[in-house]
Amino acid sequence: MKNEVNRAQRAKKTCIFLTGATGTMGYAGMMEILRYPDQYELRILARPSQKNKELLAPLNLQHSTLNIIWGDLTKYEDVLKGVTGADIVLHVGGMVSPQADYRPKATRRTNITAAENVTKAVLAQPEDHQPKVVYIGSVAQMGDRREPLHWGRAGDPICVSAYDHYGLTKAQAERIITDSGIKTWASLRQSGILYPAILKNYDPIMFHVPIRGVLEWATVEDSGRLLERVCRPEVPAEFWNNYYNIGSGAEYRLSNYEFECLLLDAIGCPKPEQIFNANWFTTRNFHGMWYIDGDKLENYLHFRANVPVKEYFARMAKAPSLPAGIKFAAKTHIAKLFPHCVKLAMRFMANSKEHGTQWWIKHNIEPRIHAYYGSLEEYKAIPDWKHFDVSHNSETPVLLDHGYDESKDVDSLTDAELNKAAAFRGGKYLGNDTWQCAQGHTFKASRRLILLGGHWCPDCFPMPWAWDREAKRNPFFAQLWAPLHDPSEDNVYGPEIFDGWEK
């Protein structure tokens, strides 16, 4: 009788398959889901490394609703085990920074293969038992959004920055999952995640961000809550089959300068002006924006804790997981007594081989200089801190035209209206979900992918990166590109830019 009751209780639970549970967002999501043992059965897929086994062993003992599948996202059979019988798939896993920044081939292999495996496994399920799929995309898909275009929304052009193979794989994986024929899906594009370990990041990539660039950050706790909330049965039907931006709200809309100030203050370090040169930072070709549609996801899922941002940074600095040295520095502010010593360490990082911005300048690495500064002349024209504008970015959004009547449901648009949208992208709509770009490539894509997701021709999609040329034939894309680039620019970045990065 007891076994029958247990089976009945289990039958009522939602079965979740989560990838990426040992990563920052995935772990937060796992811990949030495990708080509701009466509602969920949780399966996770994790590589059988010693580190993962040590991390997950205590949880496996504490939580009877947790089932660990030891395997690999790039192996279809392992993914199929997790997907089979699940009610919802949360695909969070893949290679991310900092590993992804140094391993382009491995990043492409892992992230794209994982998306293909998840899609194949979901489509292999009986149609009446096909799980919902939530894909975690990235703000990196949207590329460089400098002023005055630092406000954006889902449906804006996909525009992955040159050298950003991670962003490229996230865009490709999003297309694979959301345009595959899966019945019920959602793509949630993650921003920068605030979590305690970010306070100890020390990497030359820290200088790849423009000082006046922006991000609408998401806290790790909000991100974890989001993953649990999207699994609830009360999520309405109209939520699904759409694209969303993840952020913790207006309080977390920061310029990169404001972020540096908050971070450095939290760990007791001097201000940016005392420990960095302004020209160590790039002036373009990163990613990040504030969200015009940022509250849309919150209105559906109610995942934000709305902790004041200064308070949140103070909390991070007190996190038990931080190294003792950082906690000591945060408490004593001792580094503020030795700004020159801190600057020496930062100078060393800016001059790091291959990825240091000053290494590019010293060795005249022209593709990097053109991508991240425009030209050597533009680099030399960067003002010092005394003359640098670090004021808060404009709070007035500039709305990009998506080329169709957005008051209408995209599924109700006529062929003529779709052709108008295609013409705005330099192409044609040929009917039956078939499109043609300005270069004559013909491709299949759903109207949701094109109009709500901001994707376009897969044959024109990098690499090579040739956005200067795309802007000349695609008015939709030109809205984003032309205001930020000189018309004479004609940069093309092929796969050769990654030569020598990895074996």
Regions found by a protein language model. Give the residues of each.
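Conserved Rossmann-fold NAD(P)-dependent oxidoreductase catalytic core, especially the SDR/UDP-sugar
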Residues: 95, 116-163
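Catalytic helix-loop patch of NAD(P)-dependent Rossmann-fold dehydrogenases
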Residues: 109, 141-186, 208-211
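Functional cation/ligand-contacting sites centered on basic and imidazole/sulfhydryl donors
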Residues: 378-503
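Short alpha-helix in the Rossmann-fold core of NAD(P)-dependent oxidoreductases
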Residues: 108-115, 119-122, 134, 169-170, ...
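N-terminal Rossmann NAD(P)H-binding glycine-rich loop of SDR-like oxidoreductase domains
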Residues: 13-36
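Mid/C-terminal beta-alpha module of Rossmann-like enzyme folds, strongest
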Residues: 229-294, 299-300, 310, 316-393
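Alpha-helical substrate-binding/gating segment
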Residues: 196, 201-204, 213-251
